[in-house]
Amino acid sequence: MTRLEPGTVLDGIDRDGAARLIVGTSGSGKTEFALSVLMAGLRRYGGTQAVMAVSGRVAADALGNRVIRELGFSVQARPVTTLGAVAFRAISASREGTGLPSPRLLNGAEQDALLRQVMAVHLRHAVAGDDCGTCDLLCVYFAQDDWVKLIRDAGTGEMPGSAASAQSSLSQQGSDSPSPTSAGGSTSADRFTRGISDAFISQLRDMLARLDELGVGVHEEPRLLDAVTEDARLSVQWRLAFALRREYIAAQSAAYPGQYRLDASYLLVAGARVVHEAFAADHADDSGRPMRMEALGLPRLLVVDDVQDTTLAGMRFLEELGNAGVKLVLVGNPDESVQTFRGSYPEYLMRRSVEGRLKAKEEQLVGGSTGADQSHMTMADVIASRISLSIPSPEDEPLPPAERL
């Protein structure tokens, strides 16, 4: 099998316009090859027209520094970044071009505060006995009427308005305490919000993030609910998830009026929509495509390392980029995925990149394709290294080391 060269890959894309899926076994040098494709792209298309996306910011910074050192300079601040950052760049450029407020990410603390506000509303409903539709879903989901106790931290005291809280307030009447609501000047609303379990809020935030990463938008809700109508338990779970998401979005809009705030997990969904809307009418006339790409800050070449860890929303974003005219080189191995718990489906994504909208051409990466001499360790090498480092065998062996053969 002939070695795969970066220039050959780019020549093929320039010739037929199809994306390339580069698959390599573990240790075959996939990241090094992806980096070499980026370097070739920067030299061929220009310093701002090639970008590499990796799975994390730390890896992006390390690889980006290598690119800058090798080139001696960089027109881009971050030639290696994340797929979410590419989406954020497109969203920012789109909104700037139309005079809309620039996007700002919500951090974890801000998301938690909004979710606590959402749940505090239903805690107040439960205390007042004025349950809403979401309260009813919470009751069914937790399978008990007193579901409030399940989402509150132990030791936070009684909720304002509850019978025990009212009795405590009556017992304090006539005392010197100046606070009619709670100690330390906290209002009852504060106590509702702060008393909610951190673990519950964390799980709720993760659930909403998974919905975004799976690409489950508002328009998909009816179809998904119809698909689970025969499973009562699953139907309640989905209905509750969608109801809480709607309330979370409403709380976000109320908390940040006039701003465009979004979760990091929603970046790829919003990015795909922005690119789709910008190029939706370009099927017949491609003359304005380069200008639209430049207006959105899209590079001519995007190299994606560890593509097997991309979420479904990420794959849709890549498909929209491919439709917009971005040259794509996807590098990965489905057997090395480490993000399946966050909405990655490696085998499906690799197959979809070839059989789906991208119609990517698959090519195999042979170890050493980057030009570096890559040695293949034998079992003797492994044993020798373990002995030299005094690493004990993982197998139980009653004989002392001196008597072992």
Segments the model singles out, each with a brief description of its role:
Residues 1-26, 33, 141-303, 384-388, ...:
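Accessory N-terminal region flanking or inserted into the helicase ATPase core
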Residues 31-39, 315:
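Motif I (Walker A/P-loop) of helicase-class P-loop NTPases
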Residues 37, 62-67, 86-90, 114-118, ...:
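Alpha-helical scaffold elements adjacent to nucleotide-binding pockets in ATP/GTP-utilizing enzyme cores
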Residues 47-206:
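Conserved P-loop NTPase-based nucleic-acid remodeling module centered on helicase motor cores
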Residues 58, 307-311, 335-336:
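Catalytic acidic motif of RecA-like/P-loop NTPases
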Residues 300-311, 329:
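SF2 helicase catalytic motif II
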Residues 315-405:
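Conserved RecA-like helicase ATPase core segment
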